[in-house]
Swiss-Prot record:
Keywords, alphabetical: Endoplasmic reticulum, Selenocysteine, Signal
Record's keyword annotation contains Signal: yes
Predominant place of localization: endoplasmic reticulum
A Pfam family that the UniProt record links to this protein: Sep15_SelM
Tissues expressing the protein: Highest levels in prostate, lower levels in brain, lung, thyroid gland, and large intestine.
Lineage of source species: Eukaryota, Metazoa, Chordata, Craniata, Vertebrata
One Gene Ontology MF term: oxidoreductase activity
Species of provenance: Rattus norvegicus (Rat)
Subunit relationships: Forms a tight complex with UGGT1/UGCGL1. Interacts with UGGT2/UGCGL2. Interacts with RDH11.
A GO biological-process term: sperm DNA condensation
Similarity comment: Belongs to the selenoprotein M/F family.
Signal peptide: 1-28
Protein name stated in the entry: Selenoprotein F
């Protein structure tokens, strides 16, 4: 039985070594990743850098460079920067599962914010993408568990009201 387990673990160990090598190569570049790249690597769009500090507790230190490239400092959430626009993405067929987001989207409240677009994307959970002056995604946040007031308050801080 031990031989069978060893044979099963070898591919997993090889994959871990490959991932560790890739992560080390990325860390040597000191790269920051786009929100899409981070999502593909399995990191949340609202990952805080303080979470990366916990990787050592789980023997996941090889992931640290990528985690640092995908995380946001806590101080970034406290800035009063106004964004040029925002896109609230949600799947129309899933909207009923998120009644608070549904209430916001179907109300007149989105019309109060300059540059806010509601975009229906098949299969998407509710996500808020904040856009810079060039129309590029500057921040991306999951609003899965936000209530209507939280969405409105956050947008009031980040977008210009009409």
């Amino acid at each position: 039985m031990a031989a069978g387990q060893g044979g099963w673990l070898r591919p997993a160990l090889g994959l871990r070594l490959l991932l560790a090598t890739a992560f080390q190569a990325v860390s040597a570049l000191g790269a920051e990743f786009s929100s899409e790249a981070c999502r593909e690597l399995g990191f949340s769009s609202n990952l805080l850098c303080s979470s990366c500090d916990l990787l050592g507790q789980f023997n996941l230190l090889p992931l640290d460079p990528v985690c640092r490239g995908c995380c946001q400092e806590e101080a970034q959430f406290e800035t009063k920067k106004l964004y040029a626009g925002a896109i609230l993405e949600v799947c129309g067929u899933k909207l009923g599962r998120f009644p608070q987001v549904q209430a916001f989207v179907r109300s007149d409240k989105p019309k109060l914010f300059r540059g806010l677009q509601i975009k229906y994307v098949r299969g998407s959970d509710p996500v808020l993408k904040l856009l810079d002056d060039n129309g590029n995604i500057a921040e991306e946040l999951s609003i899965l568990k936000w209530n209507t007031d939280s969405v409105e308050e956050f947008l009031s801080e980040k977008l210009e009201r009409i």
